[in-house]
Amino acid sequence: MNSFQKLLSDSFLWIEGGTAMVALLHLRGLKRQYWRFFIYFLALVFICEAIGKWGGAYISFSKTKYYNYVVIPFQFIFFYWLYAFKSFNNKKLFWTLSLLYLLSFIPSEFYFKGSKIIFSFNYTFGSFILMVLVVMEYYKQITSSDIINFNRNRMFYVNLGVTLFYIGTLPFWTFYYLLVEYKQIWNIYFDYFLVSGIVMYLLFSISFIWGKQNS
């Protein structure tokens, strides 16, 4: 990691924390809406990231397993809930997608472990599910009669952030082992990963400041 990437990485974490603070400042006004769970989610993600960064100084643990089995599944399942359960009002879709994602750990452990092509099958599959939900959300917003007021739709900012970060970096994490052999390409994509993560959390902050949502 070069000095620029180190700066981006540190900024990423603190912007996550800043976003959590912005969200918590809006908790009182959203206590009766499901968006309060998004606030809790952002706060927990920051805590998880802080543990991932500094927790090793106090307790020995595998960061790879921590992220693969705790942090990332938590993030994916929350977004499935936010999109399928709440935005689309489809409880069955949420449970189906969550189950499919959890089942993807089976082939990931038994068939793709140690693969030099696919870095993490369960992450790739989870991101693919999220990509489908993102496209569905765009369709919902585009066909909405309230499209003219898209800038006041909190979900617009969330969806854009998820698109840039999770969907935009899907090829990077899927073909990580292949890309690492091409250092220049890998560095460019890693820079994008860090920048898009920062932009995503800034968009999450904007969603609380500018966005409004009924429910």
Predicted regions and their residues:
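Terminal, non-globular segments
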Residues: 2-215
